[in-house]
């Protein structure tokens, strides 16, 4: 599925990585992105924006840009995708990185809105790994679990939907079927 409008929130927990490789990657990818074309470093790979374990962000064809703090296995990364203002935000264990405030539209990383995206501005959540043979992630889109582990906090969005570990930014909806049907 691809999101074309709205403000969405989900959480990803980095569980483990094998082989001691470089990094996890958490973010979004455009419809024209390729998982086999060295994302996101290749300029021909349309619309990928990710946060690496180093705390750097990478956008299609660009080198890393310092954004936040490093994260590792056990950390929960919150992702706030703002398609109204073409931005993406990340939090680590409930604290927004880079002094960002998604509810106030401050900070955040810009999303590519180039012709490479078809349709322009259509994104899907992605996780991945670079230079490591395997990585394990678990995502919470509002069901209240990371795999079989329940969240402790059960925060809901402004629509009263979802069970998230950390607070959903004001004006954002948890990325689940109920909210997609109503707001997607």
Predicted regions and their residues:
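PRY/SPRY (B30.2) beta-sandwich protein-interaction domains
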Residues: 1-184
């Amino acid at each position: 599925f691809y999101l074309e409008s709205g403000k969405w929130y989900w959480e990803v927990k980095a569980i483990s990585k094998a082989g001691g490789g470089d990094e996890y990657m958490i973010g979004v990818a455009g419809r024209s992105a390729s998982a086999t074309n060295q994302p996101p470093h290749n300029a021909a790979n349309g619309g990928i924006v990710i946060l690496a374990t180093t705390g750097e962000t990478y956008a299609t064809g660009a080198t890393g840009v310092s954004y936040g703090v490093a994260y590792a296995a056990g950390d929960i990364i919150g992702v706030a995708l703002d398609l109204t203002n073409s931005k993406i935000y990340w939090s680590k264990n409930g604290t927004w990185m880079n002094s960002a405030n998604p509810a106030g539209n401050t900070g955040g990383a810009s999303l590519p809105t180039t012709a490479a995206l078809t349709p322009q501005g259509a994104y899907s959540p992605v996780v991945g790994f670079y230079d490591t043979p395997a990585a394990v992630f678990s995502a919470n889109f509002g069901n209240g679990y990371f795999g079989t582990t329940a969240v402790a906090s059960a925060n809901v969005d402004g629509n009263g939907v979802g069970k998230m570990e950390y607070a959903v930014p004001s004006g954002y909806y948890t990325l689940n079927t109920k909210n997609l049907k109503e707001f997607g």
